[in-house]
A protein has these predicted regions:
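Hydrophobic, small-residue-rich transmembrane alpha-helices and their short perimembrane loops
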Residues: 1-146
Length: 146
């Protein structure tokens, strides 16, 4: 029974993170395609770097996978299963929301870059700031599970 509760946390850590990545990447990819279309329609070069905008939210799935495995190891090492479950649920949600909103910012970045051709470094900086939330969540969750 104890491990079954922990399985909920493991599933949420990965599942919620991956759902956020799917939504975020979808938003960013749609905007990238739209920006490329505008570039082609106006005879401007289409910046390939927008592929990176589209893929940025995918890293949160990796963080969810890592957290899932850390939860399993923590429970096998004697960590409370309820703590593991709730850590997986709330950390998975935080990581997933980070990916969701990172995708929205990446979508806005693709639109802006497609229209102006400028600001790439600035766009990556703000995308990276949102990534930091997921990294902090992963690290703080690992500390909580020790």
């Amino acid at each position: 029974m104890i491990m079954n509760i922990a399985f909920i946390g493991m599933a949420c850590a990965l599942g919620l993170s991956a759902m956020g990545s799917a939504f975020g990447s979808g938003f960013a990819a749609q905007a990238s395609v739209g920006a490329w279309k505008k570039c082609y329609a106006n005879g401007k070069p289409a910046p390939f770097i927008m592929v990176a905008f589209s893929g940025a939210p995918l890293t949160q799935t990796i963080y969810g996978f890592l957290l899932m495995n850390f939860i399993r190891s923590a429970v096998e090492g004697g960590c409370d299963a309820m703590l593991a479950m709730f850590t997986g649920i709330f950390a998975g949600l935080a990581i997933g929301l980070s990916a969701f909103f990172q995708g929205k910012v990446a979508a806005a970045s693709a639109d802006a870059l497609g229209e102006t051709g400028k600001g790439t470094a600035n766009y990556f900086i703000v995308i990276g700031i949102i990534e930091t939330v997921a990294l902090f969540t992963l690290v703080f969750s690992l500390l909580l599970l020790q």
